[in-house]
Design a protein with these regions (language model features):
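Metal-dependent enolase-superfamily TIM-barrel catalytic cores that perform enediolate-based chemistry
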Residues: 150-263, 268
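Metal- or metallocofactor-binding catalytic centers and their adjacent structured scaffolds
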Residues: 27, 32-34, 67-135
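A cross-domain feature marking catalytic cores of carbohydrate-active enzymes
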Residues: 78, 155-158, 183-185, 208, ...
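Shared catalytic-loop signature of beta/alpha-barrel
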Residues: 86, 94, 254-274, 279-380
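Non-catalytic terminal accessory/regulatory regions of metabolic enzymes
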Residues: 6-10, 15-73, 80-81, 86-89, ...
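Glycine-rich, aromatic-flanked loop segments that form ligand/cofactor-binding clefts
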Residues: 123-161, 207-210
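Flexible C-terminal active-site loop/helix
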Residues: 19, 25-43, 56-61, 331-407
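Conserved, mostly hydrophobic/aromatic
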Residues: 30, 71, 92, 124, ...
């Protein structure tokens, strides 16, 4: 009798949980997916180091909202124009409507299939987890374990500038409260870029940790190219940066040159190698870990994989003694998605905070949000505490700069 009684209680509890699960699925059933393409202005011309000869006065963002039966809306965005919205409408919406929006793991296959068809839409998973967080009434990073409440940010610059101007920039950056800065290497002769690092180190000493981004992972289509480094050039630059006490060198070789990256890493002492923003899919990152290419992995939650899939990548990195420090130079929603991600993992370090006035200040990156992220007095960022990813759209601004609608 005792054994039979003990079996009955779990059955009743199971029935209750089943009813709750059924109610949740009904509430989270996806009813609509809509996209708006925005052309967001920059306050001044911006000359990206990774696009020689390019001058940007604005940037495209495709804002995607996934609506559920009970009125909860999950929001995400891609740094892309109408092509992203078309991909969503063709390859994603037909497979999401009617599905359980609170079950992202069941839907990640849809996003991967779209990527196979040439349309990377991993960023959509952010909206699904936004729904989950709002249903649970919790910030996403807390749902995922809340490894920390704050992360140390570094100021990511985006242009190639003279040594004199960059020193002045770095004085301002330090005064703003940052403890680290990332500089760009894109001169035909890397020795010119090394002079900039030398000047910043000489003038600011140890007030700022220095990171360097070579952007050698691949030339972006449609943007001005830059001279690709040979393996020996990467070695020579790395040795000079090591001498100057630089923390890491980012993307010194092609993103798929696994053997070259490992050889380079094996030759270094204190300088770390970082990269991964241009790699896609959990399998590529597993290969980067297996081959020992980097000390620091830099997947982006709206570019590289689904945001929760990157949490899995972080676990692979943790097992190998590596850290994850995401790329975030996209838009404010992407920045916050990555912030929740790193706040939920134990193996992170510095967090990228794009800020290159006058052309690309942090406020421009996050202009479609009501509250613009900024560092605290310790140079750290804290994820928003509201449910989901915790941001609110500036609907007036979004409407003002919307140039196309889908769904």
């Amino acid at each position: 009798m005792g054994r039979l009684a003990n079996r009955a209680a779990p059955t009743q509890a199971g029935d209750t949980m089943a009813r709750v699960d059924t109610a949740t699925r009904a509430a989270a059933r996806i009813t609509r997916v809509r996209s708006r393409v925005l052309d967001l202005p920059l306050p001044a011309d911006f000359r990206p180091a990774w696009g020689r000869g390019e001058v940007q006065g604005s940037f495209f963002v495709t804002l995607v909202e996934i609506e559920t039966e009970d009125g909860i809306t999950g929001v995400t965005a891609a740094e892309a124009g109408p092509e992203a919205a078309v991909a969503i409408e063709r390859f994603v919406t037909p497979h999401l409507v009617g599905q359980d929006g609170a079950a992202p793991e069941r839907l990640i296959g849809v996003l991967r299939d779209a990527e196979v068809l040439g349309s990377p839409v991993y960023f959509v998973e952010v909206a699904l987890w936004d729904i989950v967080g709002k249903l649970a009434g919790m910030p996403v990073y807390r749902l995922w374990g809340a490894a920390t409440e704050r992360v140390r940010a570094y100021c990511a610059t985006g242009e190639v500038r003279t040594a004199e101007r960059r020193v002045e920039d770095c004085r301002r950056i330090a005064a703003d409260g940052f403890r680290a800065v990332k500089l760009r290497f894109h001169s035909d002769d890397p020795r010119e870029d090394i002079k900039v690092v030398e000047a910043v180190r000489r003038e600011l000493g140890d007030r700022l940790a220095i990171l360097v981004d070579a952007n050698q992972a691949g030339v972006l289509p449609g943007m001005g190219g830059h001279r690709q480094w040979s393996f020996q050039t990467a070695v020579n630059v790395a040795r000079e940066l090591e001498r100057l006490g630089v923390v890491w060198l980012e993307e010194p070789l092609s993103r798929h040159d696994y053997a070259g990256l490992r050889r380079l890493r094996d030759r270094l002492g204190t300088l770390q190698l970082a990269g991964g923003e241009n790699n896609h899919g959990i399998q590529e990152f597993a290969l980067l870990v297996e081959k020992g290419c980097y000390d620091v992995l830099q997947p982006d939650a709206v570019l590289s994989e689904g945001v929760y899939q990157i949490k899995k990548i972080a676990a692979l990195a943790e097992a190998a003694g590596l850290v994850v420090a995401p790329h975030t130079w996209t838009h404010g929603i992407g920045l916050l998605a990555n912030l929740h991600l790193v706040a939920s993992i134990p193996n992170t370090s510095l967090f990228e905070f794009p800020h290159e006035p006058p052309g690309w200040p942090a406020s421009a990156l996050s202009q479609m949000l009501v509250e613009k992220p900024w560092i605290d007095q310790d140079g750290c960022l804290a994820p928003p505490q509201r449910p989901g990813f915790g941001f609110e759209l500036d609907e007036e601004l979004v409407e003002r700069y919307t140039v196309a609608r889908f769904g």
